């Protein structure tokens, strides 16, 4: 796996986050290289104020901080940590960090953007750029050519302004746009909907997974969450909008709830939804984090999760494995990990490898999903503590 980005007689050493000894995926892609080549061709004067949006692991921030003032905007906690790691490893100049819910800096001279996967997130970003930037500020976005559709360009033209595209290079294409669309369209960042029969209403910020409707996996999981008066602390890992946390809170009013996600928007949505549906007297905590980094061992009675199989644009199963390993670490003896996943992902084999064959059972299944429960071995009588 290549870790050296070599362009224009410069070299950067870049790693994904968290670093893994057996990593097979690069920390940058051809889209980053295309943006770098394009901006280098502009021959910008030094000390420009550059805003980089959705910089996956900081390749662009590292590159441009050499001569410019860089602000990195991302909804991803992992992107922030990866960029910080790579900036430090390459002894780069200081970079400012913002989430994509923060205001666009007003003194921006150039915006560079990796296009987000979610159209809701894209529309939010375009509307914020239009509200803040002068028409003189160039905006250059990039994505795989096959992901830039006519509908994508229409969103640019509607919410941002005049837009054109480049030729394809290494299967990527640039999008050049100007903040001059009329009229300026105000976009509400929050999408709100309820779940029939559950008495739950959910607020969803633009980059929340399945933020416009209840996904099938969550609907299935809702039917199989336990009511257990012995539960003192429940963790919802990869919480999204916090739906499972809310339901567990309704079923188990005695339980302390911790909701964790790597998306800042997911964490804020979960916080709002827990407060709205359970009230402000409950013991709840919502945290942006890389899985369960920094959690105290043996601190929870139950962890529930629906692991993602994407990290940024890449398909990978290492996140699920990290979630399972972290959950085992922080569960009490006898604590339970409740997992939902697509049938084809084979989570049962991973869980049996980690928890032992006899400690993993099938809770429920349908033609698409399985729900599995893994129990951390209870301490044996007479065992050394």
UniProtKB/Swiss-Prot annotation:
GO cellular component terms listed in the entry, alphabetical order: cytoplasm
Keywords carried by this UniProt record: Cytoplasm, Methyltransferase, rRNA processing, S-adenosyl-L-methionine, Transferase
Compartment(s) of residence: Cytoplasm
Highest taxon listed in the record's lineage: Bacteria
Catalytic activity: guanosine(1835) in 23S rRNA + S-adenosyl-L-methionine = N(2)-methylguanosine(1835) in 23S rRNA + S-adenosyl-L-homocysteine + H(+)
Main localization category: cytoplasm
GO MF, any single term: 23S rRNA (guanine(1835)-N(2))-methyltransferase activity
EC number(s) reported in the record: 2.1.1.174
InterPro entries, alphabetized: rRNA_m2G-MeTrfase_RlmG, RsmC/RlmG, SAM-dependent_MTases_sf, Small_mtfrase_dom
Pfam families documented for this protein: MTS
Residues passing through the membrane, by range: none
CDD domains: AdoMet_MTases
UniProt record similarity statement: Belongs to the methyltransferase superfamily. RlmG family.
Function recorded in the entry: Specifically methylates the guanine in position 1835 (m2G1835) of 23S rRNA.
Protein name: Ribosomal RNA large subunit methyltransferase G
Organism of derivation: Vibrio campbellii (strain ATCC BAA-1116)
Gene that encodes it: rlmG
